[in-house]
Amino acid sequence: MAQPERKHALPRGTVLRDSYRIESILGAGGFALTYLGSHTGLDQKVAIKEYMPDQFAVREADRATVRPRADAGDDYKHGLRRFAEEARTLAKFRHPGIVPVTDIFEENGTAYMVMEYVEGESLHQHLGRVGTLDEPGFRAIFDPILAALAEVHANGILHRDIKPANIYVRADGSPVLLDFGNSREALGTKAQSLTVAL
């Protein structure tokens, strides 16, 4: 599979918070970049998501600092707050069907979310490889995902973007739900015009 390219991505070897080294880019969306990283002290792979909204920000010449575009400062700040809120919300969950968030921090004028690196493939890729699922195969993936969603819903959060690309099948066959960027608290908040895609 070809590696995603993104002209605003942090260079390989960049060290964040004196602990996390950028190894490569895993994915790029309109609001965030996801990197394969390593925790330099623990010698562990991690996934690092960086808030980097193309329409609201640019990367400075130092190839690290993120600066809001002149006409988008308020939108950038709003999205940054949402990104941090989503990370803090996800960090509360301890469920095998939800990827653990282990750290969040601000640096370079933006925010970063550190998560367990999940080895495997998206359900979309999995279905392309194995074809149609029989009932036991379907239940092996969706029973744990439904249990994860029940946990999320019990805490007043709606995922709002369930699709094969956002369900990852680990190397051991267990599924995990990714990308809570379109999630929203079900009660007690008004609709926001900006949704941060984590």
Regions found by a protein language model. Give the residues of each.
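Protein kinase catalytic-loop region centered on the HRD/HxD motif
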Residues: 147-157
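Activation segment signature within eukaryotic-like protein kinase domains
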Residues: 141-142
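Protein kinase glycine-rich loop
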Residues: 23-29, 34
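AlphaC helix of the eukaryotic protein kinase fold
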Residues: 60-92
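Conserved N-lobe loop of protein kinases adjacent to the ATP-binding glycine-rich P-loop
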Residues: 38-45, 52-56
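Activation-segment/catalytic-loop signature of the eukaryotic protein kinase fold
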Residues: 104
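Conserved short submotifs of the Hanks-type protein kinase catalytic core
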Residues: 108-122, 126
